[in-house]
Amino acid sequence: MFAKATRNFLREVDADGDLIAVSNLNDSDKLQLLSLVTKKKRFWCWQRPKYQFLSLTLGDVLIEDQFPSPVVVESDFVKYEGKFANHVSGTLETALGKVKLNLGGSSRVESQSSFGTLRKQEVDLQQLIRDSAERTINLRNPVLQQVLEGRNEVLCVLTQKITTMQKCVISEHMQVEEKCGGIVGIQTKTVQVSATEDGNVTKDSNVVLEIPAATTIAYGVIELYVKLDGQFEFCLLRGKQGGFENKKRIDSVYLDPLVFREFAFIDMPDAAHGISSQDGPLSVLKQATLLLERNFHPFAELPEPQQTALSDIFQAVLFDDELLMVLEPVCDDLVSGLSPTVAVLGELKPRQQQDLVAFLQLVGCSLQGGCPGPEDAGSKQLFMTAYFLVSALAEMPDSAAALLGTCCKLQIIPTLCHLLRALSDDGVSDLEDPTLTPLKDTERFGIVQRLFASADISLERLKSSVKAVILKDSKVFPLLLCITLNGLCALGREHS
């Protein structure tokens, strides 16, 4: 809940800026000005960098005499109160305007974040540059030695942070109401319900998290470029990348790079610059769909019992954001040749732990012995296919995963994949196409419309066709929707 609140906060106040959301409340105390942070770039363009806080400050690793305390500039940042609600019935407000929805049943998830008045603390950069002149970093420091051994890691220094001024509360309220006699309702979080044979079931769940004063909710860093002799410079200009001199950049993967080649999307745009093409963004998505069919082929080739079991776990993940948030870093660790930590598993409930272990076993990973991860080439390919889908799901907007899960229950995922392939250059598909027949149903189309809207695609049903329009500044969400739909479709594909 804390991670969701901080992400929503930055989405509102610093959407295109350099601030980074704090995802774990326990990390707040570690975020001191001039603390050293490592930034690890990940494999696919949509994955956000991974930051790790070191138990050192910049002054701790300099060879010269004691480093002076930084000059800190403090200012009021903003008084922030955000309220976010997802409605299954009624009107959905999007950047496209109002999208009318007409669904059976109703569901509302409301998350309210009230951080109140926030304080910004930042280092005086000009003074920091003057204080750092002619100084060198001790690259023999044991902690930095471990950083140097890492793959694609960049050393950064924390130069600004946003903190709360008073105690605040983050609350999440969930109400689920399902029409059991017809359409499948939408659940955006796992809630235990007792359904009657043909009636309405309502269950409320309230969760409150208290945040103490002086809690850091966001921070900013500057990358360092470190030379072989320990001299360093601050990367102040956008586009200037940090790193270590003569350290060869390699794929941030532990497995055979050939396994990744099909997934690299070399021709796809970087996530930061949006989807663009001379033929238009819809054309890019259609090209991606053709490539994705090949990428997810290992799913379609699985024996039916294994495919069904893996599909069931993915559907459980779609309705369980806590499990999804743990599953991605576990896959990250396995890619790097690391075993999942006991602490990570301890964050999960017993049923979630069972699903996680079952997932890893189904994709060929062993948690026993000295070498974690898949062993043979076939298992590596299967694991990477699963990791590919997990990483895309993890970066989807809030509620999109649950909407995908609802579409799985309605068995319309193949219909949506076909819709993307069948779109004309101007974004129109004929509803007389037999495969698109489910979209004639008003309730089903409303759910699909909301799913596409969450991925910055406006979907409008005309008299005998469907028209799709991608937002001008949509960035990577349409591509992520394309990836997740194709992955789930491959898992549900019938064996020939």
Swiss-Prot record:
<feature type="modified residue" description="S-(2-succinyl)cysteine">
    <location>
        <position position="417"/>
    </location>
</feature>
<keyword id="KW-1134">Transmembrane beta strand</keyword>
<keyword id="KW-1003">Cell membrane</keyword>
<dbReference type="GO" id="GO:0043410">
    <property type="term" value="P:positive regulation of MAPK cascade"/>
</dbReference>
<dbReference type="GO" id="GO:0022829">
    <property type="term" value="F:wide pore channel activity"/>
</dbReference>
<feature type="modified residue" description="S-(2-succinyl)cysteine">
    <location>
        <position position="156"/>
    </location>
</feature>
<feature type="region of interest" description="Membrane targeting domain">
    <location>
        <begin position="1"/>
        <end position="56"/>
    </location>
</feature>
<feature type="modified residue" description="S-(2-succinyl)cysteine">
    <location>
        <position position="408"/>
    </location>
</feature>
<dbReference type="GO" id="GO:0098586">
    <property type="term" value="P:cellular response to virus"/>
</dbReference>
<dbReference type="GO" id="GO:0008285">
    <property type="term" value="P:negative regulation of cell population proliferation"/>
</dbReference>
<feature type="cross-link" description="Glycyl lysine isopeptide (Lys-Gly) (interchain with G-Cter in ubiquitin)">
    <location>
        <position position="120"/>
    </location>
</feature>
<dbReference type="GO" id="GO:0070269">
    <property type="term" value="P:pyroptotic inflammatory response"/>
</dbReference>
<dbReference type="GO" id="GO:0005886">
    <property type="term" value="C:plasma membrane"/>
</dbReference>
<feature type="modified residue" description="S-(2-succinyl)cysteine">
    <location>
        <position position="235"/>
    </location>
</feature>
<feature type="modified residue" description="S-(2-succinyl)cysteine">
    <location>
        <position position="489"/>
    </location>
</feature>
<dbReference type="Pfam" id="PF17708">
    <property type="entry name" value="Gasdermin_C"/>
</dbReference>
<feature type="modified residue" description="S-(2-succinyl)cysteine">
    <location>
        <position position="45"/>
    </location>
</feature>
<comment type="similarity">
    <text>Belongs to the gasdermin family.</text>
</comment>
<keyword id="KW-0209">Deafness</keyword>
<keyword id="KW-0472">Membrane</keyword>
<keyword id="KW-1017">Isopeptide bond</keyword>
<keyword id="KW-0564">Palmitate</keyword>
<dbReference type="GO" id="GO:2001244">
    <property type="term" value="P:positive regulation of intrinsic apoptotic signaling pathway"/>
</dbReference>
<keyword id="KW-0832">Ubl conjugation</keyword>
<dbReference type="GO" id="GO:0007605">
    <property type="term" value="P:sensory perception of sound"/>
</dbReference>
<dbReference type="GO" id="GO:0141201">
    <property type="term" value="P:pyroptotic cell death"/>
</dbReference>
<keyword id="KW-1010">Non-syndromic deafness</keyword>
<keyword id="KW-0963">Cytoplasm</keyword>
<dbReference type="GO" id="GO:0005546">
    <property type="term" value="F:phosphatidylinositol-4,5-bisphosphate binding"/>
</dbReference>
<dbReference type="InterPro" id="IPR042377">
    <property type="entry name" value="GSDME"/>
</dbReference>
<feature type="site" description="Cleavage; by CASP3 or granzyme B">
    <location>
        <begin position="270"/>
        <end position="271"/>
    </location>
</feature>
<feature type="modified residue" description="S-(2-succinyl)cysteine">
    <location>
        <position position="168"/>
    </location>
</feature>
<dbReference type="GO" id="GO:0005737">
    <property type="term" value="C:cytoplasm"/>
</dbReference>
<dbReference type="Pfam" id="PF04598">
    <property type="entry name" value="Gasdermin"/>
</dbReference>
<feature type="modified residue" description="S-(2-succinyl)cysteine">
    <location>
        <position position="180"/>
    </location>
</feature>
<dbReference type="InterPro" id="IPR041263">
    <property type="entry name" value="Gasdermin_PUB"/>
</dbReference>
<keyword id="KW-1210">Necrosis</keyword>
<dbReference type="GO" id="GO:0012501">
    <property type="term" value="P:programmed cell death"/>
</dbReference>
<keyword id="KW-0449">Lipoprotein</keyword>
<keyword id="KW-0043">Tumor suppressor</keyword>
<feature type="cross-link" description="Glycyl lysine isopeptide (Lys-Gly) (interchain with G-Cter in ubiquitin)">
    <location>
        <position position="189"/>
    </location>
</feature>
<dbReference type="GO" id="GO:0005829">
    <property type="term" value="C:cytosol"/>
</dbReference>
